């Protein structure tokens, strides 16, 4: 396996997240390389490092976002699933998970915080894009795809993961969700400048 670890940072990353990424790739049998984005918007922060990984010759891509928390063995579980595209669920806020399913249990979309994709499957789903959104009605049963109006551009966040997942869903190639969940990190208090005794960030982890 030739694994491209894609970290679509827009400028910052949690240090423990980096430690966990290194721990995970060292725990599996693969040749790996890290591809990062720096100070780039969504979706360019995804598409550009993925393109670099394609050029490098990656056979698999592990998308890992900069604020994630990874339990030991999560990458091995993604690989062992054998799915063309597999993802771990994680909370977007306390008590609210990322994965969305239809009434039959099929995955409409997951987040891109911990997602493993085979090269061919990823190429068929690219590029990530944010120029469409979905209007959800009928108590979550009906999803209508619409182009984001000019008046709303610049006022939205994300949606690349929803567009990505829904494209796979409509092709009857839904994302596989592994049993293990990941977590997210957030800053509770920023370090106080020029104070040794308060020179660190207080960071909390949110899990399922």
Protein language model features and the residues they cover:
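Conserved catalytic core of nucleotide-sugar-dependent glycosyltransferases
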Residues: 50, 71-146
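A short, glycine-/small-residue-rich helix N-cap motif at loop->alpha-helix starts
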Residues: 40-45, 157-158
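C-terminal catalytic/acceptor-binding lobe
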Residues: 129-208
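Active-site nucleotide-sugar/metal-binding loop of Leloir-type enzymes
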Residues: 47-60
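N-proximal low-complexity "stem/linker" segments adjacent to membrane-targeting elements
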Residues: 1-37
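Short beta-strand-to-loop acidic/aromatic patch adjacent to the donor-nucleotide binding site
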Residues: 58-69
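Residue-level signal for alpha-helix termini/capping positions
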Residues: 26, 54-55, 79
